[in-house]
């Protein structure tokens, strides 16, 4: 079966016989999926250094080559694309008309490690993780790390000075807000767990605690990694891990796993009703229909 059910609660979210459909393949390592207003999926082929587009009628095309080995992507509340780039250690914003603006490159006088994944809050704040993977061979541009920590940052609405929210992760990676944005979930690939924080004014974080632990082996060769993470409209947390996409209830119960044939890098919601999970996994992109919609973010109109 495509879905391993650990709790009856999972059956409300997805059919245990739901098809995990491969919609495209032949890539190097897929990441950063984001559903666009024209009914297409943009995603990164990170080691291949390309950004690609999939459309159900037009197939796969190349959008940017080279892509600065971009990784996580999202859209802001105005529909602009927000992109994490490994080669440039940057977070950039691209308008639908092609205008490109660099939003963050440094913390103080030191270059960011390699921005990895990114979300946008309702007030327009941009929150991103900054592990070191983009300084490793294959994943970005091999070079020495300038910072002595791996953090989570905030770019204020309208710009302004970069704010460091937390700096005690080994390798921060996927992140998502709770439905009311009172909580921020951030996973740590190296420690194979998810932490959750209370969110205060200006997205200051407090009361960090474990939400789910011992998720996989943190082994890059095995692809057994905690990586991308998203939320549904009921507050359940979806995270990549062993065998596919693990689903956790808001109180941290592992409800089950949507099994995917290849190691998964990320996931995101798409289609007009936001009830399809699009899942980049190694050399391919998959999708599965759900019974629940994704948590509605600003761009999900």
Please give the residue ranges for each predicted region.
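A short beta-strand motif characteristic of beta-propeller blades
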Residues: 19-24, 58-64, 101-108, 160-167, ...
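A short loop-to-beta-strand structural motif that recurs across blades of beta-propeller domains
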Residues: 50-52, 90-92, 150-153, 193-195, ...
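Blade/loop signatures of beta-propeller domains
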Residues: 1-19, 146, 204-205, 296-301
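Blade-level signature of beta-propeller repeat domains, shared across WD40, Kelch, NHL, RCC1
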Residues: 268-301
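Beta-rich, blade/repeat-based domains predominating
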Residues: 25-40, 66-85, 89-90, 107-126, ...
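Short loop/turn segments immediately following beta-strands, especially the blade-tip
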Residues: 196-205, 289-297
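Beta-strand-rich domains and repeat architectures in extracellular enzymes and scaffolds
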Residues: 2-8, 17-50
């Amino acid at each position: 079966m495509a879905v391993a059910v650990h709790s009856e609660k999972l059956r409300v979210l997805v059919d245990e016989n739901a098809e995990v459909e491969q919609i495209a393949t032949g890539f190097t390592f897929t990441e950063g999926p984001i559903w666009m207003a024209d009914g297409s999926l943009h995603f990164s082929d990170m080691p291949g250094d390309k950004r690609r587009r999939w459309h159900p009628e037009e197939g796969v095309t190349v959008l940017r080559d080279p892509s600065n080995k971009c990784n996580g992507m999202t859209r802001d509340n105005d529909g602009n694309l927000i992109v994490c780039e490994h080669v440039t250690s940057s977070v950039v914003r691209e308008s639908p008309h092609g205008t490109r603006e660099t939003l963050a490159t440094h913390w103080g006088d030191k270059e960011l490690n390699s921005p990895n994944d990114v979300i946008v809050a309702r007030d327009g704040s941009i929150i991103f993780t900054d592990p070191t993977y983009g300084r490793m061979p294959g994943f970005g541009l091999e070079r020495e790390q300038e910072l002595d920590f791996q953090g989570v940052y905030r770019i204020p609405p309208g710009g302004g000075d970069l704010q460091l929210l937390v700096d005690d992760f080994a390798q921060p990676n996927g992140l998502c807000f709770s439905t009311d944005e009172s909580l921020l979930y951030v996973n740590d690939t190296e420690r194979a767990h998810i932490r959750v924080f209370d969110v205060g004014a200006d997205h200051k974080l407090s009361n960090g605690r474990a939400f789910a632990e011992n998720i996989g082996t943190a082994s890059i060769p095995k692809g057994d990694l905690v990586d991308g993470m998203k939320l549904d409209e009921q507050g359940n947390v979806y995270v990549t891990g062993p065998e596919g996409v693990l689903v956790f209830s808001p109180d941290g119960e592992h409800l089950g796993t949507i099994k995917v044939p290849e190691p998964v890098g990320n996931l995101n919601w798409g289609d007009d009703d936001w009830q399809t999970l699009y899942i980049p996994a190694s050399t391919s992109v998959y999708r599965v229909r759900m019974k629940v919609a994704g948590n509605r973010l600003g761009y999900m109109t």
